[in-house]
UniProtKB/Swiss-Prot annotation:
Disulfide bonds: none annotated. Residues 1-24 form the signal peptide. The record marks 283 as: Transition state stabilizer. It comes from Arthroderma benhamiae (strain ATCC MYA-4681 / CBS 112371) (Trichophyton mentagrophytes). It is found in: Secreted. Probable phosphomutase that may have a function related to the manipulation of phosphate groups on carbohydrates. This is Probable phosphoglycerate mutase ARB_03491. CDD domains: HP_PGM_like (cd07067). Its EC number is 5.4.-.-. GO terms for molecular function: isomerase activity; phosphatase activity. InterPro entries: His_Pase_superF_clade-1, His_PPase_superfam, PGM_Phosphatase.
Length: 335
């Protein structure tokens, strides 16, 4: 079964582009770093346990930028417009292999698995209950949102609506985990917002954006047919299988393997998507890995919370890989 995880990740990894150079292939190498100083969550003095993203308007720091002088006087009054102008200026003046992007990372609202873990305790949950589909009272296989979870997603919706009045730059693209709690959170957060026709809410379901793989049934996704019928307006990425090929009932993904998987996800996104402002609806563990990959300080999110991050993306190329040379080396190694 563990081989299925490796096979699935390998197949997904092959979707990343290779740049042809004669008979050799150049493998794009993408590195990420956080650009700090724009959001309160960047500050080590800010406590994630008490921080209220909704009250803080997603945490944008109201400050002057060196690009303000090129804005109209009225737009200078709007912190989000000044921030957007700054980000677009960074991209305008960046090297050809460098770009900047803003990720709005949203954790799903409370799911039934969260309720069960709180009720039974983490040890009993990890040792026993998480391996079952439910306890006879509630079901947590591919856990759905509770009423509280739906309310949390609507808080995120209201926060977006409030900041839209302050000219927040809207996501140009939406991505979501294929697990139901994220699919539903994205729907309750964005589907009722008055978005412009140029930036509609049509999320793309990304297999690699899901929570830690294996063992816990709450992290086993439903079939492709279920997702397509329940969320008919969502797009599903190419290669998305009917059945869950990544979940293993015997093997739980390590934190380092999860980091590597989320790095592949970011590589896939930034190899194909030129958007600057992006929304990703995901999980506590997945977001923890993304923050680790981009070099952000650790910042745990409560269910339903959102953290924005400004990141720098740099693409370089490794030395060309020559299949014939590689084969020669292997043959020589047999002598």
């Amino acid at each position: 079964m563990a081989g299925r995880i490796l096979l699935g990740l390998t197949l997904l990894a092959t979707s990343l582009p290779l740049l042809a150079m004669g008979d050799a292939a150049v493998v794009p190498c993408i590195s990420y770093s956080t650009v700090p100083g724009y959001f309160l969550q960047d500050d080590p003095a800010v406590d994630p346990k008490t921080f209220d993203y909704a009250k803080e308007g997603f945490g944008l720091i109201d400050q002057a930028y060196d690009t303000d002088e090129t804005l109209d006087a009225e737009l200078k009054k709007l912190p989000w417009r000044r921030f957007e102008h700054k980000v677009r200026s960074l991209n305008k003046h960046a090297a050809s292999n460098v770009r900047f992007a803003v990720l709005f990372l949203g954790r799903h609202g409370q799911g039934f698995h969260n309720v069960a873990e709180a009720y039974y305790g983490t040890k009993a949950w990890d040792d026993y209950w998480s391996k079952l589909d439910g306890d006879g009272t509630i079901t947590w296989s591919d856990a759905h949102l509770t009423e509280e979870g739906i309310s949390q997603a609507k808080v995120a919706r209201d926060t977006w609506a409030g900041q839209m009045k302050n000219s927040i730059p809207l996501p140009e693209v939406y991505y979501t985990s294929p697990l139901d709690r994220c699919l539903a959170t994205a729907k309750f957060t964005f589907s009722k917002l008055e978005l412009p026709p140029s930036k509609p809410f049509i999320p793309t379901v990304k297999e690699l954006l899901r929570e830690t793989l294996g063992v816990h049934t709450c992290d086993r996704r439903s079939s492709r047919n279920y997702i397509e019928s329940t969320y008919p307006t969502y797009k599903i990425e190419p290669g998305f299988t009917q059945k869950d090929m990544l979940w293993d009932p015997e093997v739980r993904e390590s934190d380092s393997d999860r980091d590597a998987r989320l790095k592949k996800l970011l590589d896939d996104i930034f190899s194909h998507d030129k958007s600057t402002f992006m929304s990703l609806t995901a999980h506590g563990g997945a977001i923890r890995s993304i923050l680790n990959v981009i070099g952000h300080r650790e910042f745990g999110l409560q269910t339903g919370a959102v953290i924005p991050v400004l990141i720098r993306i740099e693409t370089s190329t490794d030395a060309p890989e020559d299949p014939e040379e590689d084969l020669t080396i292997k043959i020589q190694g047999l002598n």
